[in-house]
Amino acid sequence: SLGEASSFMINTNVSDSRQVTETTDDFESYGLTLALDTSLGNQSLSPYLMLSKTDYQDDADSFSLMGGIGGYFPVGDRNSFSYGYSYSDSWNNSNSTDTSAWETDSIGHGITLGHDFAFNEIISSSLGLGYSISEARVGTNDFETYDFNVRLNLAFPWAYISIGDALSFNDYMHVDTSITADRIRSDYVNAFDLMLTKALGDLIPFLDRSKSLYINLSYEKVVSEANIINYDYDAESVSISFSRSFHLNK
């Protein structure tokens, strides 16, 4: 039977983007997420469904549907294994200003496997493998992706630090003659990230006496290299966010 501690989540979001110049790139997006967290035996299961729509100022509107399930189970006191499957369907309604949008309509499948290990109460690690395939209406957009990632987590009493590195290898299946006539695109992306989370109350006690408001700092560096130079790029980003937890029944 399903676990008694099951929970169900409904999440909606709306975002709006307006640019000072080049307003043709303005858009609004809408999203709905339904998710269930439950258990079956020693398995923790999390099926989900996500729907989204993006309305562009001039370009074709885009839609997407994604569903899947993730799960994990412990082995002993230090090990746990995770797995997941996802299905996605995305499409565009071509209009007079974007008559080829339908070419990127695609259906995708993905699987993931992961292993978490706790060295002690402070140090833990995560390893992950993934495979996905995306098949579009026009074959030049078909590709397979192979993922590998590793993460080290440090749960210090004064802060939580997470360091991760991920590799993604993308292999396209057909030649894109609009770019080159004799080479099938193949590339890889290396993403390194560093995240730090700390309670605001540790820094400014009178603003957060309960230490339930957290500051999240993150840094990410992405390097992409391909056998077609058009797709080579480097990118760096820094972000800060705040999060707070609370109980509805207290």
Tell what function each PLM region has.
Residues 1-250:
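Gram-negative and organellar
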